[in-house]
């Protein structure tokens, strides 16, 4: 990114790579994750203040192990090698790396030797997080051994004159007691960064960039009302105003009042050009009689493409398509070390013959940064902090066929759940919460009469990133209020159940 201090992280396949980048940005210093294949010349052109070599799953002795351009070490730019990165640095400078009989994984206690630069003002003994197979058994000549541990005699090294540093542990992981302090020392004391990166100056720079790219031409954006597409629309509108047109497809599978809310915020408050497509009947017709969850997803995804294509083809002189691709999407799909390759299409995978130039202004930001950006742009909290919501909408929160009656039950019950969770002050504490209709009826008694009505399920989970989750311990009195309201205020419900399954073995969504 232009006009900002950059700390470059080279990716060698560690599961913690994104954490390194995140930690640096938390200091107010811009950081990017790039392939380990970058050449020294390419890095020189990027002009970073510092370079971090990440950890990785390989042994340096594996035939296909990842290596970097060794010219990096001669650029005069400070380098911090983490785990595998320290081993590469050691090999380059004639140190010795050996395979360990047993992989070291977990917490370890290190002891400092003297007062190393990166460990300034931290205790002599401290807990760190190890995750390695190989280890450095002889430090390179002219390098100091800064820390040791019982199982890793060389846990940290440095050559202060050359601004080269290495740690065998992972400072980016919270389990490392003084990891943030170590990274902070590297970024500010060694690299000389000032910490001038913020969402505010991101807005200024990105607005200027969009204006230069678009000129007097027009941009199309698929607006769902979700966090990413909403923030993209707000940012681009700030840059080019009426040159932006948004298409909002209401497929009838949204949450209560969601469609109206999107139109109020963006058409009325932001004064954007929005084309709202009421496609409810079209989608429900296609879903009639369909119970298989994967088939439901496929039908909805394909139909969205057709609807969007129909509307886009009516517009004249559109040159650009805006998408809410995030930095996590770029990392997952674009690095050489990615274990799982994903294709990210925020509008569901548009036809290949739609000849637009993509604009992805959020593709250097993480989710929490996007939320902060949205707040800075004036997007209301109720949208910025929206619950994660699947593309197929309420259709996959209904087990079995999607009907008007089933949608109404899920829509009303979900609204009550969200209202009560917010009243209890739990809406920022719980990662995701929603109701699901399992399509099960049971016998009950209401008003002295027998009933035979639907069961509604509540799903609420806590999580850091959605990859794993645990069921949320909602207080009993809150659950009682929710249950009472669901049974009394939603037609055709006489029983409420709470899902107490973690992920794994279950997924967060039921379908």
Curated annotation (Swiss-Prot):
Keywords attached to this Swiss-Prot or TrEMBL record, sorted alphabetically, are:
ATP-binding, Glutamine amidotransferase, GMP biosynthesis, Ligase, Nucleotide-binding, Purine biosynthesis
Q: Which GO terms describe its cellular component?
A: cytosol
GO molecular-function annotation terms? ATP binding; GMP synthase activity
Question: According to the UniProt entry, what is the EC number of this protein?
Answer: 6.3.5.2
Keyword flag ATP-binding? yes
**GMPS ATP-PPase domain span:** 197-386
Q: Which residues bind ATP?
A: 224-230
> What PROSITE patterns does the annotation carry?
GATASE_TYPE_1, GMPS_ATP_PPASE
Catalytic residues identified in the record:
83, 170, 172
What the protein does? Catalyzes the synthesis of GMP from XMP.
The UniProt subunit note reads as follows:
Homodimer.
What is the official name of this protein in its record? GMP synthase [glutamine-hydrolyzing]
Please report the organism this UniProt entry assigns to the protein. Answer: Oceanobacillus iheyensis (strain DSM 14371 / CIP 107618 / JCM 11309 / KCTC 3954 / HTE831)
